[in-house]
Amino acid sequence: MAPETKNDFLEIADSDADSDIGYNSEEDDMQKGGRGAKRRKVESDDEDDPGSDIGSDDEDEATEKDSKKTQEEDKKEDQPEKPKRKSKDTTSTELPDVTRTLTKKNLVASEAAIKKSGVVYLSRIPPFMKPAKLRSLLEPYGTINRIFLAPEDPASHARRVRAGGNKKRSYTEGWVEFTKKKDAKAVCDLLNARTIGGKKGSYYHDDLWNLLYLKGFKWHNLTEQIAAENAERSSRMRAEISKSTKENKEFVRNVEKAKMLDGMAVKAKAKKRKAETHTEGQEDESVRQVKRSFKQVPLAKKKMDGEDQPAEVTRVLSKIF
């Protein structure tokens, strides 16, 4: 029998050394962040079965995702958290909400934003345009905070409806508040005296914009102006009401006075008539009491037959007869 060239004990030692090193390519690749090589069994049964390969691929992908997640979490833990900076600009540039009541703190914070805001005046509102439609048309040119549109006279609306016209509400003029002055100025420069545009078949396509930037004018000035107009209107109404009540009282007083004077006149006439009838009765009594005496003319004496006529009478009578 020939002697063996290889030493079995040396081969066993080498294998033990390799096991002590413990190199694992998959673990190394995971630590480096790379993708581990897929393991495939050399056995004929595993090669013939395709389901085993799919299952091994799924397991490898799941382990790879878990490793990536753990690495990302480790990186986040290693990085120190940065303190959040309080942004002063956001609190100062934002205008206060219209629906909320302004507290003292919010009022102080909104003063800077109010100074930066700008107001645009619309001298004419297209017929039957609502505030929501106006906001949608002007919103692309800048951030809008508040809109106020003055409604038409109720009497004119009632006349239009009675005549068979449109029943929708219309507005005569309006004010739009932008959060930035430059946006308000740019809107006026860009859109003033130009058509509203949009789709050709839209209702407001051919209407013109009438925009004017109010320099130095703020929203509180508008509210003060509206409050002053309302106060003036109410004071004028109170003055008219007091005047009408005064006239009504004067009219009632004059009517009562006229009735009183008429009653006094009727009483005076009745008294006078009564006095006249009383005096007439007294005169009748006095006439009845006094005897009337009339001076009578003496009667002519009848001529006697024996008396002679004068000579002249006889002579005239003789000439006649």
Curated annotation (Swiss-Prot):
Pfam families named among the record's database cross-references: RRM_1
CDD domains per UniProt: RRM_ABT1_like (cd12263)
Amino acid composition bias (Basic and acidic residues), ranges on this chain: 64-82, 276-288
RNA-binding is among the record's keywords: yes
Gene3D superfamilies reported in the protein's UniProt record: 3.30.70.330
One Gene Ontology cellular component annotation held by this UniProt entry: nucleolus
Location(s) in or outside the cell: Nucleus, Nucleolus
Gene Ontology biological process terms from the UniProt entry: endonucleolytic cleavage in 5'-ETS of tricistronic rRNA transcript (SSU-rRNA, 5.8S rRNA, LSU-rRNA); endonucleolytic cleavage in ITS1 to separate SSU-rRNA from 5.8S rRNA and LSU-rRNA from tricistronic rRNA transcript (SSU-rRNA, 5.8S rRNA, LSU-rRNA); endonucleolytic cleavage to generate mature 5'-end of SSU-rRNA from (SSU-rRNA, 5.8S rRNA, LSU-rRNA); small-subunit processome assembly
Presence of keyword Isomerase: no
Keyword field: Nucleus, Ribosome biogenesis, RNA-binding, rRNA processing
Chief location category: nucleus
Region of interest (Disordered), residue spans: 1-98, 266-291
Domain RRM: 118-208
GO molecular-function terms, A-Z: RNA binding
Domain of life of the source: Eukaryota
Acidic residues bias spans: 11-29, 44-63
Role played: Involved in the small subunit (SSU) processome assembly and function, and in the 18S rRNA synthesis. Required for the early cleavages at sites A0, A1 and A2.
Family indicated by similarity: Belongs to the ESF2/ABP1 family.
Entry protein name: Pre-rRNA-processing protein ESF2
UniProt source species: Gibberella zeae (strain ATCC MYA-4620 / CBS 123657 / FGSC 9075 / NRRL 31084 / PH-1) (Wheat head blight fungus)
Organism classification: Eukaryota, Fungi, Dikarya, Ascomycota, Pezizomycotina
